[in-house]
Every structure is written in C-alpha cells, then in structure tokens.
Amino acid sequence: MLITHLIDSLSDRAVITPLTPTSVIIYDKNELKVYVGFTNNRNSLEYTKEVVLLLSTEIPKKAEIREIIVSKNGDYVILEGPRSLFVVRIGAEILVAKPDRLPSECFCECYPLHDSLLLQNISLSVVKVRLLPEKCDEKTFVTAVLFSDNCIRFYNLQKKFDSLLLAVDFRNHLHQVHDENVANNTFGLQKALVSFDLIPPKPNTSHFSIISIDSDCDFYTSFVHFSCFKEGYAPRIHRIEPVDGLPCDPLDLRYIQTTNPRICSVFVLVSGGGVLSHLVVFPNEFGEFRFLVKDQLRLPSSNGDPRIVQNQIRSLKVSRYEIATSSSLFSVNIFPWFEALTSISPTSTLEKETRVSELVDAVIPSDELSNTTKWTGARALRAVSVQLTQSLATEEEELLPESENIMHLVILENKDGQPAHLFNISTFDNIWSTENKTSFGRDSVSQPPMKSTGSLEQQLAALKPLAACVISEKVSCEEAIDAAMKFFDAVDERLKKHCEISKLFVERCLAVSSSAQALDEKQQSVDQRLIEETNTVEELKIRMHETKERMEGARKGINVLFHRVDENVPLSDNEIRIFERLKEHQKMLSDMTKLVPKMTLDSNEIHRMANIVLKKRGTGEEQNRFAAVEKNATEIESLEARENKLNTGISELSI
C-alpha cells in the first residue's frame, strides 16, 4: 500500500512517532494505529500492514494529544496532551511478529495517568514528559512528568492506580533571594521550569540524576536514589551557578546518548531562533555537577521553533540526534569532539567540531508539485525516521553485508492546506556506524578501505626456492655464461624482493614500536590514576574511621541523655522536637556506621585489583619480532656466497 494514501488521509492534528526501528505509531481522529514494513519500491514508499489498536479505555474526543512518547523497547506508549496523559501497553505480538502475520486489529490496555490531579486543579497543565530508559526493578518502570506548578512527579507505569512514586518540588528554588522584608516586583513575569531530562543510571548502580532548566536559563540538579521511591522522601535540589554564553529563551533540554557515559554526560539546549547549545556535564566528588558549554550552532532561520525528533534506530541516536525546523530536517553528529574529549590518547585533539547534515529539504521544486511550497506554520515539521525492509535493497546495496536503509520522512502542507510529504533514503553500512567516515545524504556512499600490502608471512611463504644453476663439461662456454647470467638475474630479483620485504618488516617494527610506546604512556597514565585513586580511598577511609569514632561518642551521649529522662516527666514541645531530631541523628549515625565497613571492603578490592594488574605487567615477556628478519638475512648471505662461487668458476672456465 502506498504511503501517499496514508499521508492524504491525515489531518492537521495527526501525531506520528517511531514505535520500533521498523514501524511507526500515529494518533489521528481519535484513533491509534501502527504501520509496519516500510519499503522503497522504485522511489515510491509503501507499507506492508496497518494495525488498528483497540484501547481498553477510550480516549475522549475533546482530548488534545500533541506528542507520543515511546519507551526504549516500544512496550509502553504515553499520549501526552496539555490536560491529559494516557498510557498504552503495546503487546509483544506487534513488536516481534512479522508484518504479514499481524492482524488488522489488536487489543491494547490503556489507562489515564493521574487524571485526578488534573481534574482537581483546572489551571494545571503538562509541560514535559520523560521516560527512564532502564527499569528500577522488575515491578517498577518510571516516567517523570513536569507540570506547570514547577513540580516533577514520578510514576510507575506498571500500576494503573496509586502509581505516584515521588514528587520533587522546585518552587522554593526558583528564586535565589528569600528575604521577606524585601518586596520583589517581577512585573507580572515569574520564573518557571520549561524543560528537564534524566541522566540514566550507570550499570550496577541504583541512582539517576535530574537536570532541569527554567525560563531564565538557570539550571537545577537533583540526585535521585531508587530508595526514594520506596521511602517517599524527596531528594535534595542543587542550584547551579549561571552558565555564561547561553541564550535567555530556552525551549527544550535533551540528554544525548553517548558511547562513554561514565566520564561525562552531554545535553543539547534548544533555544529560540534555532540556537543549539551542547553542554558537557561533569559530576564532582560532592554529587553535584559542573557545566561546560562545548559549542553553539545556529540553524537556518525558519518560521517557528525547532523541535528534536524522536528516534528508535540505535545507529542514529548514539552521539547524534535529529532536529526539525519548519523547512528542513537536520542530523547533528557530536561523535568527533566527544570521542576526542573522552580519549586518553596523546594524539587526540579537542579542536574537532560538530557535524550538521541536512537530511530533507522541504522546498519542493515547482515542476514536481506546482501547488506545494514549504510549510509556513508556527510549528516544526512532522518528521520520522524508519528502517526500511532489508530484503528489498538494490543490487549495489546488497554488496554491503551489514547495510541499513533509513527512510527520513517529512510531512508538510501545500497552499490548499492538504498534506504532502518528502522523503530521503540514506544507506549506513558497518564502516559508517563504527568509524563515522561518511555523511548523511541522498547518495551516501561508503569510502573504500585502504589498500593493504598483505601479510608479510604470506609473502614469505609464497617465495619458492631458486632453481639450481648446474654447469657441466658437456655444455659450451656460451651456454654456461648464458645460464649463469640468467641465474644472476633471478638472484637480483630475489634480492630486490627480500629488500622490499625487509623494508616492510622495518615499517611494521616501527609501527609496533610506536604503538608500544603509546601503550606504555597509557599504562603509565592508568597507573598514575590508580595511585591517585588509591590515595584518595585511603584518605577517605581515614576520615571515615575518624567520623566513626565521633559517631560512637555522640551515640553514647545520646543514649545517656535518653536514660536520664524519666518517662513520666512531661516534656515541652521544644524538648519533644529536640528528642525527635536526636532520634533522626542517631539513625543517621547508625547508617553511617554500616557504610564504613563497606568502604573498607571496596578499598581493599581496589588494592587487590591494582596488585594483580601490576603483577601481570611485570611477568609479561616481549616476543622476538625480528626472528623473520634474521632468517631473511641468513638466506641473503647464502645467496651471496653462491654468487661469489659461481663468479670464481666462470673466471676459471674463461681462462
């Protein structure tokens, strides 16, 4: 079925988002549909199957849906509107089954998310919704919602009722001055949070972070532990010092998935006027963050504000993202400077820049669509990227064993208000995805690999022994001289070949030597970092033991104080409050006492691993890399001896 018919049937309020790398989900006219199996048949886009999702809870016709948020695996879908939030659970048969085996209709569970909060407060609205990529546990799948009351609320999507886990209130932190004696006049304008995003938890950790931004471009961070959801206490909020050089009209803040998130995190700040600011966030030893503005880009001027496009294709969302304006769809690649930033190689440089490629231009030539111009509305293009079916690739693309055909589809409007579409197909192979040597484009072609000289061992094995030059008495003098000259020519050719191979061996040895030197420098830097970390752990352990002693003394004093107080003696409110505070401190001291042995075990484990690494490096034996060169030198000497012997025989024969 042609995708043109699908585009023509969409209304101006249709919302389209990728569900999986090979399928999209569309909400339009109070219906939720999934389209799978996209192919390119002679420059005409087609889809294989249309699946209508029958929801258990019908979405009201008056509900306005402006965005669809999809989980990492596509099993949860959130329909977001200014005054509504609906959660849809997608069945596994839609995500796994082949397109031709899917039914035309499929039942899905649907339920509203905290609708009572929106019904009780008429002025409350939804600002942003974010999903935590990883589950906290088997029964908790977390989503965060920013409401207009400057509160971020966390919900468990696996619960229909009582799904609220935690609420983080930023209202008391939006204003730096809290002096009641000073009257603050904001002239009717008040600060409010405009966007936020989550830093996913690292492997084998049980915490994540929140980075939020308000209308004055001030940042706020919070460190959330999974235990906060169970115990119900809000985390501490840190206000970040103002970052210089950022625009004062922020629109959206997004976390960018990178190849090495352990060292730092990268965010993109979308501001008015099409300005993109890439922020590198470094955590410090106190659990806070330090912001660094890496670079800033300005997209071509267009009507409306740019919008980041969701993507489910891994090769297009790691160290890169897509952003749509009212006239074009762009791909932004931060891999060059991020790889240089996180690399410890001495040859790396930090002068590399962000790469921006235009995927689709919404200006259609007049000879193709005479009634179509670029979209002139106040919002960004509706864009989506989907992986095409691999089996229908062209003959040239089949030569690449691990190639992917990605369709970038853009939906716009013509003069008559009817929907139109443009698309671009890019081919990404294994070379592009690993080395990032090609760029986005309609005619994207991978660069050929460098010409290899082959294995030196194979070249040596291919050399056959020279035929013996036998001169008997029955052979005439001229024939003997001719045979000897041919043998000398063969010897010269063999000598030249051995010289070339020797040069290649020398070049390889130099390359190995330089690599070994670079590896040695890396090992020294790692050793230095291990020593620094070990010293830090030792200092921390000493401080922890000192703290433990102080805690023991404080605990004894608290216990003595508790025993001195008679239970029948009435206490004042201040005394009761003091004793409650003392109990809290006693609990905190007990928790800190439990942490000291754990820190000791961790430090001992680091010592043990460092000793193992040093022992392995000390017992390593260097292989003899010049054995083949010595063997070739011996063969060359034998050939020279045979040549001298033949010269002597020829001189005696001529005499």
UniProtKB/Swiss-Prot annotation:
The keyword Cell inner membrane does not apply. InterPro entries: Nucleoporin_Nup88. Pfam families: Nup88. The keyword Transmembrane applies. It is a single-pass membrane protein. This is Protein npp-24. GO terms for cellular component: membrane. It is found in: Membrane. Keywords: Membrane, Transmembrane, Transmembrane helix. It comes from the Eukaryota. The chain crosses the membrane at residues 263-283.
